[in-house]
Amino acid sequence: MKTVYVTGYKSFELNIFKDDAPEVYYLKAFIKHKLLQYIDEGLEWVLIQGQLGIELWTAEVVIDLRVEYPDLKLGIITPFYGHTSKWNEQNQMKYNKIAQEADFMESVHHTEYEGPFQFKQTDQFMLDHTDMTILIYDEEQEGSPKFFKRMLVDFINKTNYTCDIVAFDELTDFINDMQWEQDQSFE
């Protein structure tokens, strides 16, 4: 397994509006934990579409991991040109900083936004060009990843593609363990 697509909720879908929110710390720690497992299995590339939330936090984790794993690569495959144009200035600056660190950048559609079909085609592109997806999504809290999950399940049923769908129970267990370990270190 050489290439993984990581996706999930957008930050506002998790009611996270600041990068210094404690939830971001725990989500990034969880993403790092997951990626380290796959690095041990030969992971070389992490791909994202460049969406706010899980995807950009994943990019930040990959950039940090490169200190210890310099062969790890980050690819950003956007649906179309200018996908950040409606974002506020702070989010655009964050994206641009991450984009400068990417090893590969490309858009599936070499046009501006034309319609929702661009997102669907980009999702399909990601499935066709990766070995696995890590999807942070829970059926209990619907959000934008539900559309991708449907496509992912259909794709898995037709191919030998693999995925790791992370529900809130797994996240909560990880966070509880992490907090317990932190509490133990203070005793």
From Swiss-Prot:
Q: What is this protein called?
A: UPF0398 protein SH1465
Question: HAMAP family, alphabetically?
Answer: UPF0398
Q: Which species does the entry assign this protein to?
A: Staphylococcus haemolyticus (strain JCSC1435)
- NCBIfam families, per the entry: PRK13660.1
Q: Which Pfam families match?
A: YpsA
Superkingdom of source: Bacteria
InterPro entries for this protein = YspA
Q: Which family does it belong to?
A: Belongs to the UPF0398 family.
